[in-house]
């Protein structure tokens, strides 16, 4: 089903209105000492079925903008032969995005980073089999996250990997981790080699994690940090898909099981 991107904007406005209107009721509920029993979430397409009686004047105003956005979003830039899911402890899609980050480190140094890292929360949809459109990538990577290349000692890298293990895994590339089902790190190697406490390693990640968010406080101990201007994760992934398509290469990824 084609997604109406113009309606996404109105969908966000509606969501904002609902948020504001619910603030008072949430505050009142707190007085009665309610407790949250369960939280669930799922992807909901914001398409024409939510707007069966569109305002004619609004449609006329938005029409030229909608056509421009649709032309851009529906552009097919590649094709995937397999469906790539996201999820812990690791997944095809998360590891692929981490590899794109790792390779993108060549923008600030003469080789890929030793490790690539992306958090599962930064990926908001799967990569389905079949055509890949610009809109597909926007659905997967809706945030304005940018590349950061961090340089850190082996001791701090181990702390980073321990944090990743405690989260039951994240999207990684260039490393191999063995973790238990309860989030304990058993072993880790970089490029097939044990981690040297005194060696400096480079980690390509996103600015959100580089700032210590997502339980990645170990990044705050980094010896160096370079975040090239304009290198958004979404832009890097779009470039990757286009380059693979131009070279007639398949989109591949690797994922292993937890210990």
Where are these regions (language model features)?
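Bacterial N-terminal signal peptides that target proteins for export
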Residues: 2-10
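Feature captures C-terminal
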Residues: 26-47, 95-98, 102-106, 110-253
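Short coil/turn segments at secondary-structure junctions
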Residues: 11, 81-85, 144, 221-224
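A short, hydrophobic C-terminal helix/tail in secreted or cell-surface proteins
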Residues: 254-259
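C-terminal motif of bacterial Sec signal peptides marking the signal peptidase cleavage site
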Residues: 20-22
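Hydrophobic helical h-region of N-terminal Sec-dependent signal peptides
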Residues: 10-14, 18
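Hard-cation-handling environments
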Residues: 51-118, 126
